[in-house]
A protein has these predicted regions:
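N-terminal beta-strand motif that seeds the catalytic metal site of vicinal oxygen chelate
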Residues: 1-19, 67-70, 146-157
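Core segments of cupin and vicinal oxygen chelate
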Residues: 2-3, 9-52, 79, 86
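Acidic di-acidic motifs
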Residues: 14, 76, 139
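Vicinal oxygen chelate
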Residues: 32-33, 40-43, 72, 81-157
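Residue-level recognition of conserved beta-strand positions in structured domain cores
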Residues: 46, 55-57, 149
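Helix-adjacent hinge/juxtasegments
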Residues: 55-85
Length: 157
């Protein structure tokens, strides 16, 4: 079976505010439609991505800001952070883990807990290893995003 991730539904409290944020982030607006006041779907896709996000009225019963751990992959974490900050996105400083493990444990765009042995250190991974340098941010509702630098993918990816 060939399974592909297509859409992630984000819970937001204000559709127009979320739409403005994701436009500022630089995602492509694919669709903004609704047959009634009770239902409206706004669909964005990150440039070059096969997976999109969708939010709006009547889309989900989940609490606004409850989605965490959405990863956006970049080839140059410092350049991506700089560009997003220039667009007005509040992005954390770049960091890496002392043990070189994949980063996880975030809420609202920032760390709230870590896996055993994780130690968050400032800056890019010293050897520039793929999958090892991160920055975080959140949308206006607190849905948490992670920028992850990947310059060389794992085999089969």
């Amino acid at each position: 079976v060939d399974l592909k991730l297509e859409v992630i539904v984000l819970p937001v409290s204000d559709t127009e505010r979320a739409k403005a944020f994701y436009e500022k982030l630089g995602l492509r607006l694919d669709l903004d439609t609704g047959p009634s006041d009770e239902f409206r779907g706004v669909h964005f896709t990150p440039p070059g991505s096969g997976c999109s996000i969708m939010f709006g009225e009547g889309m989900t019963a989940a609490a606004p800001g409850s989605v965490q751990g959405l990863y956006l992959i970049v080839s140059d974490i410092e350049a991506a952070r700089r560009e997003l900050r220039e667009r007005g996105i509040d992005v954390s400083d770049v960091f890496h883990d002392a043990g070189g493990v994949l980063f996880h444990g975030h809420e609202g765009g920032d760390v709230t807990h870590r896996a055993p042995g994780q130690q968050r250190l400032a800056g890019r991974h010293p050897q520039g290893n793929s999958y090892s340098s991160f920055a975080t941010f959140a949308d206006p509702d607190g849905n948490g995003w992670v920028l992850q630098e990947i310059t060389e993918r794992f085999p089969g990816r």
